[in-house]
Amino acid sequence: MKQESAAPNTPPTSQSPTPSAQFPRNDGDPQALWIFGYGSLVWRPDFAYSDSRVGFVRGYSRRFWQGDTFHRGSDKMPGRVVTLLEDHEGCTWGVAYQVQGEQVSKALKYLNVREAVLGGYDTKEVTFYPQDAPDQPLKALAYVATPQNPGYLGPAPEEAIATQILACRGFSGHNLEYLLRLADFMQLCGPQAQDEHLAAIVDAVGTMLPCFCPTEQALALV
C-alpha cells in the first residue's frame, strides 16, 4: 500500500512547528510528546515513535467531513476523510504515539506536510484516555480540520458520503481503502468502541458496491 506521505512533486512545505511549550507535555517526561491519530494515522503513522497506545478522546465525534484532493481524491473529485467535531457527548477512538528527543521535530515536520500542507488540518490539544489505563489520561496533539479550511466539505447524508468515497482515488490509494481500514481498526478496539457515523457509511458502501463495479472487482477492493 502506498504511504500517506508527500510525493516528489508535492508543493513546497511550510516551516515545521518548533517543539515548545505550545505543544502538550506530560509531567512524566517533559521532553516527550504524544500525538493522537484517529484516521489514517491509526494504521500508517509513517514516523518513528517510542510507544503507542490505543484509547479514546472525549468531547469529540469523528466525521467524514473533510475533503481530500491529494491522498484519497483529486481536485476534480475530492475524497472524504475524517476530522473531529466538538460534541459534548462524543467519544472518538484512535491511537496515541509517543515521540521523544529527535523524534519530536522529525515527526512534526513530516506531519506538517502530510496533515497541514496537503490535508488542511490544524493542531489542537486533546486529552487522551488509554484503553488499558483510562484513569491515567495524557495530553496529546491532534490534527483537526475546521470549517475555515478550504478543503472542508461539511455534513452530508451517509449515503452521499458513501457514494463519494466509492468514486474517489488519490496518491495514497482508493478512498474505500481508507474507510475499510478505519472500520477494521474500530472492530479491533472491541464492542465498547462505537462510531455510528462510520458504521452507517460502511453499511451504505456494502449496499452500493456491487452497483459500482463487477463482483470480482468489488471483492478485490474489499
From Swiss-Prot:
Residue ranges the record marks as coiled coil: none
Protein location: Cytoplasm, Cytosol; Golgi apparatus, trans-Golgi network
Expression induction: Induced by chemical activators of the unfolded protein response (UPR) such as tunicamycin, DTT and thapsigargin.
Ligand binding (substrate): I35, F36, G37, Y38, G39, S40
One of the protein's GO biological processes: negative regulation of protein processing
Reactions accelerated catalytically: glutathione = L-cysteinylglycine + 5-oxo-L-proline
Role: Catalyzes the cleavage of glutathione into 5-oxo-L-proline and a Cys-Gly dipeptide. Acts specifically on glutathione, but not on other gamma-glutamyl peptides. Glutathione depletion is an important factor for apoptosis initiation and execution. Acts as a pro-apoptotic component of the unfolded protein response pathway by mediating the pro-apoptotic effects of the ATF4-ATF3-DDIT3/CHOP cascade.
Record-stated family: Belongs to the gamma-glutamylcyclotransferase family. ChaC subfamily.
Assembly with partners or alone: Interacts with NOTCH1 (via extracellular region).
Designated name of the protein: Glutathione-specific gamma-glutamylcyclotransferase 1
Organism of origin: Homo sapiens
Lineage: Eukaryota, Metazoa, Chordata, Craniata, Vertebrata
Gene name for this UniProt entry: CHAC1
